[in-house]
């Protein structure tokens, strides 16, 4: 996103306050979450301190990301910004979320994918996304599913890609 808000909103998803740029590429994504999460996002998202922290962290990352052309060469930068946002906003300081990220990193390590994957905190709820670090290198994330399930998480393998 280049400006806050969803670029697509309303009943027909035609217009919204945000503006975004991107590219289309098939990218596998493992999503993992607890069946019974601790705090629900609604318990803190309206807190003025959290709003300020999240807004400032988002603004800093958007400033960096809004410069230059958008194509797959920016993937690593996007991953770095996602991690920086979770730290700067304080969301990654939450013990329950931090534990989820650690589980994802340990599972990636055991699967021999530590250097090939990035474990990212999802910003709403308590969940993580595990994605490849290098889009030009084909890796299988399927091995992570059973390991994450063994850790007590619900999981799914999905992908980013062209809109149908």
Pin down the residues of each PLM region.
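ATP-dependent small-molecule kinase catalytic core of the GHMP/sugar-kinase superfamily
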Residues: 1-87, 94, 135-137, 149, ...
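Active-site proximal loop and beta-alpha junction motif in alpha/beta enzyme cores
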Residues: 60, 114-115
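Short amphipathic alpha-helix segments
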Residues: 93-114
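Short amphipathic alpha-helices in soluble, non-transmembrane regions
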Residues: 99, 103-104, 139-152
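Active-site signature of cysteine proteases
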Residues: 115, 134-139
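Short beta-strand
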Residues: 118-123
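Glycine-rich phosphate/pyrophosphate-binding beta-alpha loops
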Residues: 126
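Short hydrophobic/aromatic beta-strand micro-patches
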Residues: 129-133
């Amino acid at each position: 996103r280049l400006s806050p808000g969803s670029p697509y909103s309303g009943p027909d998803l035609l217009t919204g306050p945000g503006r975004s740029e991107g590219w289309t590429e098939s990218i596998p994504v493992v999503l993992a979450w607890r069946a019974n999460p601790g705090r629900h996002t609604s318990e803190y998202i309206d807190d003025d301190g959290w709003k300020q922290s999240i807004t400032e962290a988002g603004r800093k990352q958007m400033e960096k990301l809004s410069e230059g052309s958008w194509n797959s060469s920016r993937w690593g930068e996007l991953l770095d910004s996602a991690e920086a946002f979770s730290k700067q906003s304080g969301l990654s300081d939450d013990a329950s979320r931090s534990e989820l990220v650690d589980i994802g990193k340990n599972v990636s390590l055991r699967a021999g994918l530590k250097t090939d994957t990035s474990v990212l905190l999802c910003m709403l709820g308590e969940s993580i996304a595990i994605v490849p670090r290098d889009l030009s290198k084909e890796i299988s994330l399927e091995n992570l599913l059973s390991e994450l399930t063994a850790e007590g998480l619900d999981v799914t393998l999905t992908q980013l890609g062209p809109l149908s």
